[in-house]
Amino acid sequence: MQPHERLDRRVGFCVLAAVLEQLTVLAPGLIGGSVARAARARGVARRIVLWARRPETRLALAEQAWCDATEETPEEAVAEASMVVIAAPVDLIVPLLRQVVPRLKPDAIVSDVGSVKAEISRLGREAVRGGAHFVGAHPMAGSEKTGWQHGKAELFDGRTCFVTPVDSTDAEAAASVARFWRDLGAEVVTIDPDTHDEIVAHISHLPQLLASALCAFLATRDPSWRNYAGGGLRDTTRIAASDTKLWRTILQENRDEVLRALRQFQDELEGFQAALANRDFIEVAARLERGRAYRDKFRPSL
C-alpha cells in the first residue's frame, strides 16, 4: 500500500497520517458504520465503498454522504481496496475473508472489528495470500444498540482499540492497521490475541453475562417491581438490552475464557455471601471498599 499523506490539525498541531485510496467496509453495523463515518469525517480515505448482504440496506447506505459507492457482492467491493474492514459478527468474519481473498489487491490489508481474536487472528492470517495481509483489531466502543443507523463519527474518540498481530503478521501491515485506528480517534494497544481474549472475557463479556443474568433473575420475581427501578438498576443492566444473537456468538467463540472468568467471579460472590451469613460486616465493608476503589480508578467517561 502506498498511501498519500495529509496534515491532521484536529488536535491543534500537525501530524503525518495515511490517506487510503479506497477503504472498503463489509457488513457494516454499528461499528462498521462508525468506521465509514469517522473515515469520511477525518479524511482517512479518498473513497469509501460498502457492501451489505441485503439489497435494501445497500440502497440506504448508498444515500449516505459518507458512502461513495455500494457493491452487490463483497468480491466487487474489495477489488480496488487499499484497506478492508470486515464488520460482520465474529462467526462470519473468517468465512467472509476467505470469500474475498481471490479478489484482493496484492498489497491490500484486511482487518476486522470482532470482539474475540485468537481464532480469527490465526485463521485470518492463514487465509490471505498473494501479498495481501490480515491484521486483527477490536475497538472497545460498542453499545447496546445495533445497526449502521446508530453509528457515529466520534464513536472511537479516545477509546481503546486492540490490534492483535500473530507471530507471522507482516510488521508494516500491523503498523498500518494501528495507524488507521489512531486516525479514527482511537488509542491503540497492540497485544497478542490470546491475552486479548482473556482481558475482554473479564472486562466486556463477563459484564454482559452479569447484566443479562440479573435481568433474567428479576424476570422471575413480581413483574411490577420493574416499575420502581431507579438509576442503579438501569445503569447496571443497560447492556442487557444488547442483541441476543450477537452475544450468543461472542460467548460461544470465547467460551473457555468466559468460563474461567465466571468461576473466578463466583468466588467473589461466595465471599460476599459468606460474610453476610456470618454477620461479618467488617468483611462486607472491606469488599465494598475494594470495589469502590477499583471503580474510582476508571478513566473519565468519554
Residue ranges and their predicted role:
Residues 87-89, 114, 165:
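Glycine-rich, N-terminal phosphate-binding loop of Rossmann-like dinucleotide-binding domains
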Residues 154-238:
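Internal alpha-helical scaffold of NAD(P)-dependent oxidoreductase catalytic cores
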Residues 96-149:
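Rossmann-like NAD(P)(H) cofactor-binding subdomain of soluble oxidoreductases
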Residues 224-291:
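Interdomain hinge/lid region at the active-site interface
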Residues 16-79:
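NAD(P)+-binding Rossmann beta1-loop-alpha1 motif at the extreme N-terminus of oxidoreductases
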Residues 74-104, 108-109:
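Rossmann-like NAD(P)-binding element
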